[in-house]
């Protein structure tokens, strides 16, 4: 058993979801001393090393309280996100703002609140869970919000470098979780994604491409736009009405 997280204090946002639960459990398996399982409505856990923590990404006061309540965190997993059914880039602006408030502003809000905590604990690690949707032509607020979060992750890596914080972006296509159940497409397991994420924490990677589709997509990104985007449209036919 790998023990790459021996003694670390981990905080996972969105800990109630399928991917979040894997982040909590694998952190324990890898030797974490404490795991804050953060969610809007936290649930109980069967391991005393897990500390349920109330955290609503869309509420600045809630995020501040969470940072105050978890002063020993040295590994922050920014995992929480939403992908509403019927989301469309030309849909109601209120819905678009709701997606961005969680997936972009919420992600950045948590990173900013915990940056001083990470600095106080030796720099630590920030891992943002992104999506291959950041690089594709899905006409959704979700894809646009993940593109913004990808850019913010790279900016945070530069911004927090001086305090010794290691910033990782994880990009992946479809994960086999309840959030993706409505799509009948190939999916990678949550366990595999989380294992790759924690391996990246241990080896110092900047970026994790967590499935074959995302790795292939990254290899195509230098293709001229006139070829790349029609190809993407063809690949994504099952997602776009």
Predicted feature descriptions by range:
Residues 47-60:
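Rossmann-fold cofactor-recognition segment
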Residues 79-85:
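Conserved NAD(P)H cofactor-binding loop of Rossmann-fold oxidoreductase domains
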Residues 111, 145-148:
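Active-site helix of classical SDR
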Residues 16, 20, 24:
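N-terminal Rossmann NAD(P)H-binding glycine-rich loop of SDR-like oxidoreductase domains
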Residues 87-97:
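Substrate-binding pocket helix/loop in short-chain dehydrogenase/reductase
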Residues 131:
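Residue(s) in the substrate-gating loop at a strand-loop-helix junction
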Residues 186-241:
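C-terminal tail/cap regions
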């Amino acid at each position: 058993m790998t023990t790459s997280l021996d003694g670390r204090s981990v905080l996972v946002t969105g800990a109630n979801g399928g991917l979040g639960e894997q982040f909590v459990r694998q952190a324990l398996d890898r030797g974490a001393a404490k795991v804050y399982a953060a969610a809007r409505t936290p649930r109980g856990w069967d391991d005393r090393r897990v500390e349920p923590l109330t955290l609503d990404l869309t509420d600045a006061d809630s995020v501040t309280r969470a940072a105050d309540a978890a002063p020993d965190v040295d590994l922050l997993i920014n995992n929480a996100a939403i992908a509403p059914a019927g989301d469309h880039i030309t849909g109601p602006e209120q819905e678009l703002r709701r997606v961005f408030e969680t997936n972009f502003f919420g992600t950045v809000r948590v990173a900013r609140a915990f940056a001083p905590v990470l600095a106080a604990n030796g720099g630590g690690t920030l891992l943002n869970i992104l999506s291959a949707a950041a690089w594709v032509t899905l006409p959704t607020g979700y894809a646009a919000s993940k593109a913004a979060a990808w850019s913010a992750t790279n900016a945070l890596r530069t911004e927090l470098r001086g305090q010794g914080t290691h910033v990782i972006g994880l990009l992946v296509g479809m994960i086999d979780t309840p959030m993706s159940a409505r799509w009948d497409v190939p999916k990678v397991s949550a366990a595999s994604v989380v294992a790759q994420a924690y391996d990246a924490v241990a080896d110092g990677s900047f970026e994790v491409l967590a499935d074959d589709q995302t790795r292939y997509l990254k290899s195509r990104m230098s293709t001229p736009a006139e070829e790349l985007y029609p190809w993407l449209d063809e690949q994504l036919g099952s997602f776009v009405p």
